[in-house]
Each structure stands twice: as structure tokens, then as C-alpha cells.
Swiss-Prot record:
It comes from Human immunodeficiency virus type 2 subtype A (isolate NIH-Z). Residues 1-103 are annotated as: Disordered. This is Protein Nef. Pfam families: F-protein. InterPro entries: HIV-1_Nef_core_sf (IPR027481), HIV_Nef (IPR001558). It is found in: Host cell membrane. Residues 1-11 have a biased composition (Basic residues).
Length: 180
């Protein structure tokens, strides 16, 4: 417990800290105090010394950020090319393409008659579907989602159920689920 200044420091760490502060002073534009070995940053007119390795007020120099080449490109054209290569989820040419998540984020409840009635009453209560902004893109997304959601077979049907093909196809037909 106690403040950080009350703890004893080992000799090797003190030497390391001084070397780091000296190196930091060279890169940040500060200067090392010759007598105490502490770090100083020049403030005009204040005459105060700071012991923190702060680089506030320093200007950005080219090459400071090594792992972010878009910050220091050789040319504006390179910057744009690099950004375009690394934009995984944003493409300007993909406005006409439509997609949706493969798996839902929350488990879907199976649609029952009661849920359908509740949903229709909820929509009517909120004013119906009139006045909603129509978007061709949203319409395609909903069509794809409904197609995907309602063409998936329940687990008890299909070729993985262990039932003979005639039987599981008859069950799908009875439920009104298309099969291919």
C-alpha cells in the first residue's frame, strides 16, 4: 500500500528508467536534465520542471506511427489505395448487393398461429404498415430473409433425421414446407 513514490526502487530499474527518459527526451523534443537525470520539457516563462515523460504540445512527425502507413504515405494516391485495400466491410460498388446474417443473433421461436395473430394485432395497434418508407433494397433483404428462414428444415425432417426419404418428404409436404 502507499503512494508510488513511497516504494523503494531497485538499482537496475532506476538505470533503465533513466535511459528510457533520455531516449524519450530525444524523440519528443524535450531535454534531459544534466544534473538530476530527470526529464524536462521546456515551457517558456514558467521555469517549472516536469518529471513525467509527457509529449504534450509536440507536433506530429512523419514516421511516428510505424504500423499505420496511411498516416505517413509517400503520396496521396498510395494513401487511397491502402485504405481501399483494407476496407473489408465497406465497398462502394456493393450497393446493389444484398445480404443478411447466416445465423440469427438470437434463437428464433417457431412461428405458430398464436404468434402470427399476436404479430398482426401488434402491427394494427401501431398503425399498420401504411406510411412506412418503401425501399427496394430493404424489400429484397426481407425477401431473401423470408426465403432463408422458411426454407430451412426443422431438425426432425430432412435427410439427417434418419427417416426414410418418402416419410420425411410427406411430413414436409403436410407442413407446407417446400423441398428440393
Amino acid at each position: 500500500m502507499g503512494a508510488s513514490g513511497s516504494k523503494k526502487r531497485s538499482k537496475p530499474l532506476q538505470g533503465l528508467q533513466e535511459r528510457l527518459l533520455q531516449a524519450r527526451g530525444e524523440t519528443c523534443g524535450g531535454r534531459c536534465n544534466e544534473s538530476g537525470g530527470g526529464y524536462l520539457q521546456s515551457h517558456e516563462g514558467s521555469g517549472r520542471e516536469q518529471n513525467s515523460p509527457s509529449c504534450e504540445g509536440q507536433r506530429y512527425q512523419q514516421g511516428d506511427f510505424v504500423n499505420t502507413p496511411w498516416r505517413t504515405p509517400a503520396a496521396e494516391r498510395e494513401k487511397e489505395l491502402y485504405k481501399q485495400q483494407n476496407m473489408d466491410d465497406v465497398d462502394l460498388d456493393d450497393d446493389d448487393q444484398v445480404g443478411f446474417p447466416v445465423t440469427p443473433r438470437v434463437p428464433l421461436r417457431p412461428m405458430t398461429f398464436k404468434l402470427a395473430v399476436d404479430m398482426s394485432h401488434f402491427i394494427k395497434e401501431k398503425g399498420g404498415l401504411e406510411g412506412l418508407f418503401y425501399s427496394q433494397r430493404r424489400h429484397r433483404i426481407l425477401d431473401l430473409y423470408l426465403d432463408k428462414a422458411f426454407t430451412l428444415y426443422p431438425e426432425e425432417f430432412g435427410h439427417n433425421s434418419g427417416l426414410p426419404e418418402k416419410e420425411w418428404k410427406a411430413r414436409l409436404k403436410a407442413r407446407g414446407i417446400p423441398f428440393s
